[in-house]
Amino acid sequence: MVAIYLDSGSLKDIERYADDPRISGITTNPSILKKEGITDYRSFARAVLSRSGDKPVSFEVLADGFREMERQAREIASWGPNVYVKLPITNTRGESIVPLLDALGDLNLNITAVMTVEQTEELYEWVRPHHIVSVFAGRIMDTGRLPTTCHPCKTLWASAREVYHVTLAEEYGYDIITLTPDLIAKLSLRHKDLAQYSLETVAQFHRDGQGIAL
């Protein structure tokens, strides 16, 4: 069964799901932090870790240059034994992160924004069993293509768009999937009886139509 990680930068969400047995970990990224108005990374991380118990938590480096990425990665890793350092598969110039993995390989790493077959093949020889590779399956499927995977380590299905992606992640052999709070709220619909769901939908339409004159 695929493990579910909460994908959020909201301390309220993190606190809400910290003890939820369905949630096995937490991920964040710079875009999520920007959306939440986070400006002090260290203080935010301390707040997250104080609420998340011993569940794995991923924090991403902010730098684009490899030297500064390495420095930030080591600092982020020092925040706690359950911390995973997210490294983008390339910098903004398209230069691969792979050469940096030799220096940082002993850390808990989460290689993120992976989308191409070539990227997964390149990682195949470098990643270690304790690493995570985040394949942006949802974004790949937005382009009308199916995602790939990388088996030497834990593989994470990122950017899920719907509950069905949980089923696909299980079928494709992924270890982890990240879900936003709105998708977690929909997990109760998994395997719901469709006849009952149909009846509930008809009842909803009937109820909502009562105030409309014809």
State the predicted function of each range.
Residues 150-214:
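C-terminal alpha-helical cap/extension of soluble enzyme domains
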Residues 30-33, 113-115, 129-143, 173-194:
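Glycine-rich phosphate-binding active-site loops on the catalytic face of alpha/beta enzymes
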